[in-house]
Amino acid sequence: MMGSMAFRFLLWLVGLGAWVGPASGPNPLRLVEEDLAQRCDRVRHCGPGELAQRLLQLEPVALFDTRSAQEFEISHIPGAIRVDPSIPAGEFRRSFGDLAAGRDVVFYCSVGVRSTALAQRLQNAACVIGAKSVCNLSGGLFRWHNEERALVSHGRSAKTVHPFDDYWARFLKPAA
C-alpha cells in the first residue's frame, strides 16, 4: 500500500510541476496552495496570518513540522516539533497525545504537500486524543518565510529555509 501511495504522490508531483511551469508572475506558490486545497478538500488549510495571530495571542496550538531532520535543523517556526511524515497514527497518539489534547493541531512542511497528506491521514487520530481541530499551514514554511515571519534554528533567529531541491527552491524569496 505504501508503495502505491508513494507512486501516486510521485505522479502528482510530476503533474504539478508540468502544470505550474517556471516560477514567474506575482505568486506561483499560490497555484500549489490552490491545487492542494482542491485535491485534499477534507483537510482545513489555515494561512500564515491566522497561525501567527494564534501564536501571538498565546492560543494553545500544537505545531508539527513534517520536513526532514536536515530541513528542520536549518530553520523552523518557533515552537514547532518535528514529526516524521510517515508516523503511524498509533505512534502519533502515544507520542503527542498529551500535547495535542485540547489544542488546535497544525502541520506544515515546505509548501504543504507532505503536511497535507499527514493531516489528512491523522485527522481521526487527532480527534480521538481530543484535539480541537487539525489543519495544514497553507503554503507551508515557504510562504511563512516569504511573508518574512519569524524562524529559528537551535533557539536563535534564522533567515534561511532549506529549499528541499532546485525545483521547489524557486518558490522561495531570497532571504533579506
Task: Indicate where each model-derived feature is located.
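Gly/Ser/Thr-rich loops at beta-strand to alpha-helix junctions
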Residues: 110-116
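Short hydrophobic beta-strand that contains or immediately precedes a catalytic carboxylate
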Residues: 51, 62-67
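Structural motif
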Residues: 62, 104-106
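Active-site-proximal beta-strand/loop segments in catalytic clefts of secreted hydrolases
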Residues: 66-67, 85-86, 108-110
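Rhodanese-like catalytic fold shared by cysteine-dependent sulfurtransferases
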Residues: 4-49, 73-104, 116-176
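Alpha-helix capping/helix-boundary segments
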Residues: 68-69, 114
